[in-house]
Amino acid sequence: MKKLQYIDRLTNQRVTEAVCYEKTMTLLYTSRLGKWLSTLLAKTPILSRIYGWIQKRSWTRRKIPGFVKRNHICVQEFKKSLSEFSSFNDFFTRELRPEARPIAQGDNICVAPVDGAYLIYPNIAEFGEFVVKSKHFSLSKLLGDASLVEKYASGSVVFARLALFDYHRFHFPVDCWAGPTRNVNGYLFSVHPMALKDNFNIFCENKRTLTELKTEAFGDVLYLEVGALNVGSIIQTYAPEKRYSKGDEKGFFEIGGSTVIILFQPGTIKFDADLLRNSRMGLETRCLMGQSLGRSLGE
């Protein structure tokens, strides 16, 4: 299996990503049998529900210390000690100490909403220039709303992929008035890069949620959470029709990998140069929640 590489934003170094359950992922996405099996898993939600139920059993706590060690996760950032987690899912949905993720200051600064690997495309209309032709992507299919497609079709898009070892709570990227969340039922295909390499439309087929944010600095912003293999539950902890500050918690994903997608209207944001440079090279940039993504063009 070809090793996955990304740019670590803290060091600006190219890093090879540790793949959780690498042998299983190789089987699922490099063999005919594996691809058939992965499709079966994605289209059979009861299997994800069973897996999620298992991960909430108390005996799964035994997996936590080894998982933390293998993935070099910093326990000093946790609100709880390792011994306090009631299950592996409880650990997976962990909260962090506020000081662990400082928020970039300035009303005109948009921040990363999650810990994850980021790809940024400043013009959705030119999306094909940044990805190989086999990676089909339909904004209409993703949003399922003609008025939203018209509104964001010439804007920008941010993809943030969360790995299994990441902190899985998602946050508001800007100061905003948050509208209600709309649920779109779908499958639970993996969003691992091995699965995405041939088809970006996985995002359009998976279970997802959409929330529109009203902002003063960035216009309207569309926020999507996309489920993935074994992620049957996207939990919203925010209350709709209220004002929030950037960095405030919006919700969390239960066990599994997942993705956040953010859409901006045209002419509203200038992304940070390093993120654009890496994305143009086809490299994800690993960011921490609260780091700058870009600044408002309306300043």
From Swiss-Prot:
EC number(s) from the headed UniProt entry: 4.1.1.65
Entries under Pfam families matching the protein: PS_Dcarbxylase (PF02666)
Membrane topology classification: Peripheral membrane protein
Record text on cofactor binding: Binds 1 pyruvoyl group covalently per subunit.
Cell compartment(s), UniProt: Cell membrane
Predominant subcellular localization, coarse grouping: membrane
Pathways per UniProt: Phospholipid metabolism; phosphatidylethanolamine biosynthesis; phosphatidylethanolamine from CDP-diacylglycerol: step 2/2
Active site positions, chain numbering: D115, H171, S258
In-chain residues carrying the UniProt-annotated modification Pyruvic acid (Ser): S258
Catalysed reactions, as listed in the record: a 1,2-diacyl-sn-glycero-3-phospho-L-serine + H(+) = a 1,2-diacyl-sn-glycero-3-phosphoethanolamine + CO2
Cystine pairs: none
Residues of the site described as Cleavage (non-hydrolytic): G257, S258
Cross-referenced InterPro entries: PS_Dcarbxylase (IPR003817), PSD-B (IPR033177), PSD_type2_pro (IPR033179)
Domain of life of the native organism: Bacteria
Function statement: Catalyzes the formation of phosphatidylethanolamine (PtdEtn) from phosphatidylserine (PtdSer).
Protein name, as recorded: Phosphatidylserine decarboxylase proenzyme
Organism of origin: Chlamydia felis (strain Fe/C-56)
